[in-house]
Amino acid sequence: MSKNYLFTSESVSEGHPDKLADQISDAILDEILKQDKNARVACETLVKTGMALVAGEITTSAWVDIEELVRNVITETGYDNASKGIDGRTCSVINAIGKQSRDITQGVDRGSLEDLGAGDQGLMFGFATNETPTLMPSAIYYSHLLMRKQAELRKSGKLAWLRPDAKAQVTLAYENDKPKFIDTIVLSTQHNESISQKELHDAVIEEIVKKVIPNELITKDTKYHINPTGVFLIGGPQGDCGLTGRKIIVDTYGGAAHHGGGAFSGKDPSKVDRSGAYMGRYIAKNIVAAGLADKCEVQVAYAIGVAKPVSLMVNTFGTGKITDNQIEKLVAEVFDLRVGKIIENLDLLRPIYRKTSNYGHFGRELPEFTWEKIDKADILKSAARI
């Protein structure tokens, strides 16, 4: 890639149908983990007009009222009237959950957490860059801020015409590989019939965009596309079918890094799609926080039933203060990449996952998000002797 370029990422609101599905899957996971930390959960959700279908494989001693939980998530997300796309109080809830295959169970469970085998094969990536305060890429960072502001204004009632479904997209102009200004902002939000297009356009610019985007990133040439189709009345599951795991780029780095292909929501942490990706972020963030590189991507891969990873790779894109191979050796010394130790060290057997399902799994420094800590940075810096 040239040193001067445009780069774009998107985010979606918690009322986007795919995100509604993610929230349901993670809410079910959370409720099970409250009762049974040894549960095996792979929960998928589909939402469409007037219905929610929950399916997957769950092995647990816990009892969860799936129907009530699904209804609560839908209404809490703002879908409490059929005119919005679905009504959690009256929609149909279909439960098609089965148990995990015994063949998988015998290959994964080892008695002790330390010896736990990976729940499946797969490759995962972690990433960090010093572009933003949370060490996230700029385009996804600002896209998430726009969507969080939209939700805040909707929930507070300040913009009473807002409805739950929305999307944002930010295009950053880079010069010499550094973000310089925002070239384009796209924001589409569902609304009711009381607002005109001009009023909506002006309110979104003044109350959402200008409240979260730094002035220094906006130029006279910055382009705005606010509800560019003109009307966004039909949204949520009525407008589009929603499925768990359909927003994996929104969940991660907005396309600024590789992705191993595995989704997160609805999966307990024995599934390395989730725990391996969280560990990758933890490693990459600590490398950048330590000053070992300006930008870092980590790949880790696992075999089903095997505790240790089959591979580890570090790429600093030429920004490393020491070689990538040297950083890899430090990572192997400082971080325990066995699946059970990842779960233990990041304290992943807690009911924290519904919070992860909106506005990205990475870059939000909440107490529950242990993979966002930079507690290994000083250790890495000292070991690297920089």
UniProtKB/Swiss-Prot annotation:
Binding, K(+): 44
Metabolic or biological pathway, per its Swiss-Prot or TrEMBL entry: Amino-acid biosynthesis; S-adenosyl-L-methionine biosynthesis; S-adenosyl-L-methionine from L-methionine: step 1/1
GO CC annotation terms, alphabetical: cytoplasm
EC number(s) from the headed UniProt entry: 2.5.1.6
Residues covered by region (Flexible loop): 100-110
Positions with a binding annotation for ATP: 16, 165-167, 240, 246-247, 263, 267
Cofactor info, note text: Binds 2 divalent ions per subunit. Binds 1 potassium ion per subunit.
Enzyme class, spelled out: transferase
Catalytic activity: L-methionine + ATP + H2O = S-adenosyl-L-methionine + phosphate + diphosphate
The UniProt record lists the keyword Cytoplasm: yes
Cofactor(s) named in the record: Mg(2+); K(+)
HAMAP family, sorted: S_AdoMet_synth1
Stated role: Catalyzes the formation of S-adenosylmethionine (AdoMet) from methionine and ATP. The overall synthetic reaction is composed of two sequential steps, AdoMet formation and the subsequent tripolyphosphate hydrolysis which occurs prior to release of AdoMet from the enzyme.
Family: Belongs to the AdoMet synthase family.
Assembly and binders: Homotetramer; dimer of dimers.
Name listed for the protein in its UniProt record: S-adenosylmethionine synthase
Organism: Francisella tularensis subsp. tularensis (strain SCHU S4 / Schu 4)
Upper classification of the organism: Bacteria, Pseudomonadati, Pseudomonadota, Gammaproteobacteria, Thiotrichales
Protein encoded by which gene: metK
